[in-house]
UniProtKB/Swiss-Prot annotation:
GO terms for cellular component: cytosol. Pathway: One-carbon metabolism; tetrahydrofolate interconversion. The keyword Magnesium does not apply. GO terms for molecular function: methenyltetrahydrofolate cyclohydrolase activity; methylenetetrahydrofolate dehydrogenase (NADP+) activity. The gene is folD. InterPro entries: Aminoacid_DH-like_N_sf (IPR046346), NAD(P)-bd_dom_sf (IPR036291), THF_DH/CycHdrlase (IPR000672), THF_DH/CycHdrlase_cat_dom (IPR020630), THF_DH/CycHdrlase_CS (IPR020867), THF_DH/CycHdrlase_NAD-bd_dom (IPR020631). It catalyses: (6R)-5,10-methylene-5,6,7,8-tetrahydrofolate + NADP(+) = (6R)-5,10-methenyltetrahydrofolate + NADPH; (6R)-5,10-methenyltetrahydrofolate + H2O = (6R)-10-formyltetrahydrofolate + H(+). This is Bifunctional protein FolD. Belongs to the tetrahydrofolate dehydrogenase/cyclohydrolase family. Coiled coil: none annotated. It comes from Anoxybacillus flavithermus (strain DSM 21510 / WK1). NADP(+) binds at G165, R166, S167, S190, V231.
Length: 283
């Protein structure tokens, strides 16, 4: 029996409708949630991502401010702009679109954002708080993945979650979020021995490595939930994930497609964090 599709597009639509109501309520209280987005250079993918984020903000009533700078700006100049936004009480969230040019240290930039405005959830203080279970802004893609799995109404407690990939943005934090939900978590990466033997043990398999169709049905246990975070463009121009969708859907119980899987939830959780930031800063 083929897997049921986890439609991230529809889930995102439902969550955004809820967020739009929260924004309306905040505005009635005299609070207009606002997100500042910084874009450095003219990288086409970055421009596309920023456009999508701004459109999503507009749809639910969040004010978004775009600051664009040329590729050759200095790190000190960028840090000055962030410092200014940190002090601006009308701005509740700050997002710097990555990657940045080579002359700018990304960690310096992330650390410069005030933790209470770090709606990407990348600041070391937010990461640390997440690790020990304190209230924090959670990184958007991992948070979106957890939301998707929870939407299935499955009991996560005691489930074996296998995460393929160990990036700071997805792999590491998503494992921590499931650990907080009392799952048993295993991390796999490029140096893992016998990857297939480990992934076949997963009740929930999360793949985020950027290798087209790496995971086939032989890597997946019958009835597993499969979350595909990868977005890869094939030579024919089509998008595909890290999971061979047509093959794996024959054995999984639930699976996310690419596109319209995890992607829409990432932006939705950015909106969620921005609304939360506005509420927290006006307590």
């Amino acid at each position: 029996m083929a897997a049921q599709i986890i439609n991230g597009f529809e889930l995102a639509k439902e969550k955004r409708a809820q967020l739009a109501k929260e924004v309306e309520q905040l505005k009635r209280e005299g609070i207009e949630p606002a997100l500042a987005v910084i874009l450095v250079g003219d990288h086409p993918a970055s421009q596309s991502y920023v456009k999508a984020k701004q459109k999503a903000c507009e749809e639910i009533g969040i004010r978004s401010i775009l600051l664009t700078f040329p590729n050759d700006i200095s790190e000190s100049f960028l840090l000055e702009q962030i410092a200014r936004l940190n002090k601006d009480r009308s701005i509740h969230g700050i997002l710097v679109q990555l990657p940045l040019p080579s002359q700018i240290n990304e960690l310096h930039v992330i650390e410069a954002i005030a933790p209470e405005k770090d709606v990407d959830g990348f600041h070391p203080l937010n990461v640390g708080r997440m690790m020990i279970g304190q209230r924090a802004f959670l990184p958007c893609t991992p948070y979106g993945i957890l939301y998707m799995v929870q939407s299935l109404q499955v009991d996560i407690i005691g489930k074996h979650v296998v995460v393929v990939g160990r990036s700071h943005i997805v792999g590491k934090p998503v494992g921590q979020l499931f650990l907080r939900e009392h799952a048993t978590v295993t991390y796999c990466h490029s140096r893992t021995n016998d990857l297939e033997a480990i992934t076949r043990q997963a009740d929930i398999l999360i793949v985020a490595v950027g290798k087209p169709k790496l995971i086939t049905s032989s890597y997946v246990k019958e009835g597993a939930i499969v979350i595909d975070v990868g977005v890869n463009r094939l030579e024919n121009g089509k998008l595909c994930g890290d999971v061979d969708f047509d093959d794996v859907k024959q054995v999984a119980s639930y699976i996310t497609p690419v596109p319209k899987g995890v992607g829409p939830m990432t932006i939705t959780m950015l909106l969620h964090n921005t609304v939360q930031a506005a509420r927290e800063q006006h307590k």
